[in-house]
Amino acid sequence: MSDEEILEAELVDSAEETLLATPTNIGPLSRIQALAIALVLLLLSSTILYAILSTKETLEEEVSEVLVVDTGIFVTNSSGMSIDIPPLDMKFNSSSVGEDAAEPSIGITSSGCIFFIAFEKVMRSCDYGVSWEEVQDPVQCAPTTSDPYGWVDPVTDRIFNVQMMGLETSWICWSDNDGQTWFGNPHDSGTTPINDHIKLATGPWTNSGYGLIGQLSQNAYETAVYYCYNKLAGIFCYTSIDGGATFELGGQIIGLATTNGGLHGAISTAPDGTVYVTPRVETPTVIVSDDNGFSWFERTMGEDVGTPYPRKNSEVSTDSESNAYHVWTGADEGIYLAKSTDSGESWTQESIRVSPVEVISTAFPQTDAGDPGRFAVTYLGSENASILGESDLDGNPWNGNGHYAPNGVHYHLYVTFSLNALDDEPVFHTRRLTTDPVQVGAICLNSGDCRSDQGGSNRNLLDFNDLHIDREGRVFIAIADGCTGECATKETPTPADSRDKLGMMFMLDYGPSLYVANGDLPPINTTASTNQSNVFIPIIDVEAIREDYDD
């Protein structure tokens, strides 16, 4: 471009200027100047307004997002209400056992090997659930089962595999070397045939009753072995003086357990030798022996909260000083606790709610304890409060009873810790451990009266799960998972999708030990070899957005 062209563009010949009108002023400014300033202000204000509106929209979006975040973490008081106390720092890992496993039992030997017993199989993991192998003996142990149970003696490390053979008898086999070799008795159910709902446990000998015999037999086996079962109208309990090889001492427990049908939960024992059996009855009750099963007495509690119908097993755990903790599902479907500090002679009568009020339906409470006041409870539960009052499987307004739960109810696995359960104002720390449901819809809680057959019977989970701690005070949980595969990934799974019974183990990775001396347990090293299948699943302790919980 030439200089002349530039001059022609920039210069105006004054002779050719024509004024159409005389400019007027607005104050000290000309009209043109005022208009320019007004346009600038308009643009500036619109920019500011846009920024404000955008910020408001962003904040609204952020608030909306926070409202649907579900942490699955609760800290509650003795009424189940939230309190302003920091939650315990803990994380759980899970592991698929790879086998069907309704009614599982779990135990841990001093070597760290985990034994998961369900149906006729004994599954062992010595690498904290990275891998599992079947270890029961094909000759010494039962090839089939009608009802399974397992137990690891925390004193001797003996592993018991108990299998009911029809209703006639039970076949018990045992191992003293982490399942490498086994011995068994195919007719090991006491002096009287016909048994059901079998349970086994071990505990110290006392100085009275059968303990007088046990004191002489400790060279044969250090602890007493108890075997209880239901037979028609009552509970029968036997005591073995030879490590469970035979059960010659004992018989029927008389009293309330007999008059109410006799179904019962797990056997529990305390360091002082006290034995507890929990009958499945309307008023929460514990049957107690302080002489190794020679005699029994019963104690009731929980009349302020009652029990639902149909009802499942309650359970007792005991701590290192023989304090006892009885947990059960109340009539309002919460998990409740009564405590005894005198070996079962007396129990607190004002029931304590263990589960958060947000968990409105529960089943299968299982418990274990470490040092005084330090115990854990696991259970299945639902937070679908919005479904309360909707039509249940019988067409009545649903009140939280899992037996009649509508199809939209999702049950998850929970664990609750307390480190001060003996205090007047205990604190409960609860975590939801599953990110997809364990069961969708109703759980059959009465074997002769299942209400749903969508996709098959909803009796798939059977009667119980299990929880035990190891020598470090680390919590291990065994469950049957009814919602696996496609069911676990669907946005809206149905009851028909939820008919599995896959064995799953949940284990405290890091967090508080139930033994004070061990403090907070560090993470477990679960490094898997390259040829292992993906059975080990870390449960990441982060907030997750899900649609199957209520606000």
Where are these regions (language model features)?
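Secretory targeting signatures
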Residues: 1-63, 538
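C-terminal PAP-associated
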Residues: 61-551
